[in-house]
Amino acid sequence: MNEEKKKRKLEERRIKEVNASLKYISSSAQKKLGILAVQEQDNVFFCEDKRYKKVYTVRPAILQNKKYELIKALCDTFHNRIRFTQVLKNSGDKIGSYMFMTVNFEAGTYYEARKEVEEFENKIQIEITSILHIDIQPCTLDNLLSYMVLNYSGKMQQFDIGRLFSSKETLNFGDNCKDAGNGKFILNGNNDNCGIVCVGKGYPHDMPEMTTLFEKEQATYLVCIDFQSYDADDKEIYRLALNSRYSNERTELDQQNVINMSYFLAVIKNDSEQLENMTDRIFDYYDKEQVLLMPGVGRTQEIFLSMSSLGMKDFHSMQNTNPRIISNLFM
């Protein structure tokens, strides 16, 4: 009995130590970044939506023709909400690309969240990446914060995570993004550093690859896709909700999995006149393929900050979809 009591006390102490390893950042940084606390050794964020998040780097070049297989495997294996953020820079002679995968974990304590993260990483390595030969690696906190600044400002600068804990530090993340109307925004108060945010609203069932725009038009693109697969119980709840909403008792969901998706596209140019001319071509391109794309009117700053922060500041607008549509929206 004494031995069991001793083991229980040791376990309780270990749980407390794990939970205490979460370091809360300054209140000013919390407001700017949407992050409440970090676990530096595990590279995990605790965010203002009360979710734990971990970010991974994905090498787009290795994906090649495996996009659909990856998305389908993630939807079949996990029920976490997952966000892919792809940044594409078309400079005319080449297209540069980098990509992140942000995974949401719901848990009451960090001890519970860490177990979920470990289970996720074991599964994705054994059941997905080792089979598809895709390289997905955890992103360190320093690198992640540097990429957040790059996505927002267009300038790469090394970020010292120690700045997050100082109340005297001033972070300007998000301050310089101004709504210019009709989904457009201006960065740093400069009309020559501007962009537009677009929101996906509808997709044809047999939608083709929607990536030729990125190859033809010189610009910087942020492609942001959230998706989540639901289990059998959640699927039935979703079906009943649809029936209630549309007063249709015959709604059936034939897919093995119910998958919801949110799609955002941001296009950034260095010239306001060029952006204006390109805007029509963007909507014409999607309209031609029967994809309903709308400017992010009224939520421009909120959406762009969510995109550039890799989902640390959360914004999404989900609708039913399938893995093929998701995979056809990024390169």
Predicted regions, residues:
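Extended, folded cores of ATP/NTP-driven motor/assembly subunits in large transport
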Residues: M1-F330
